[in-house]
Amino acid sequence: MINLRPLTENDLPFLLEVRNDDSTRQFLENNSKFTLKQSLKWFRETQPKWYIIEVNRFSVGYIRTNGDEVGCDIHPNFRKKGYAKIAYELYLKDKDYASLWVFEDNFAKNLYEKLGFVTNGKSITIRDRNYIQMEYNGK
């Protein structure tokens, strides 16, 4: 069973394990590595509305949110198993609108399109790659 639960301070070591992995960072706008000390400060100051993705109560990834923007990172050991798709479906089920940014060459773009996200024409260049915005307008 897959579910989303709010991120807690105790989840930060797991979050860093996923976030600081090179295979995750290559697809993030800010690809810096973070320390636990930096992450604790961030968590305590911002109280983010992020969610841990659990499969049978085992953490496999997380959903990032910032207002209407959403993103998802899955631990490298659990990718290509459909967890991101289900997590997005759970997160989006009650949403009228969401947006995200994705590198145009990121294979996850196909997933976003299947979920109903469409490109809106906004793009920027980051590290010589095209970073595009996609929007979801409910179902």
Residue ranges of model-derived segments:
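A short, well-structured alpha-helix characteristic of acyl/acetyltransferase catalytic modules
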Residues: 1-33, 37-41
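Short hydrophobic/aromatic beta-strand or adjacent loop that forms the aromatic wall/cage
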Residues: 48, 129-134
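Conserved beta-hairpin
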Residues: 49-61
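A conserved beta-strand-loop-helix scaffold within acyl/acetyltransferase catalytic domains
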Residues: 61-68
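A short, internal acetyl-CoA/4′-phosphopantetheine-binding micro-motif in the GNAT/acyltransferase core
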Residues: 69-83, 102-103
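Conserved acetyl-CoA-binding loop-helix of GNAT-fold acetyltransferases
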Residues: 80-94, 110-114
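Conserved beta-strand-loop-alpha-helix junction that forms the acyl-donor binding cleft
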Residues: 99-113, 117-118, 124-130
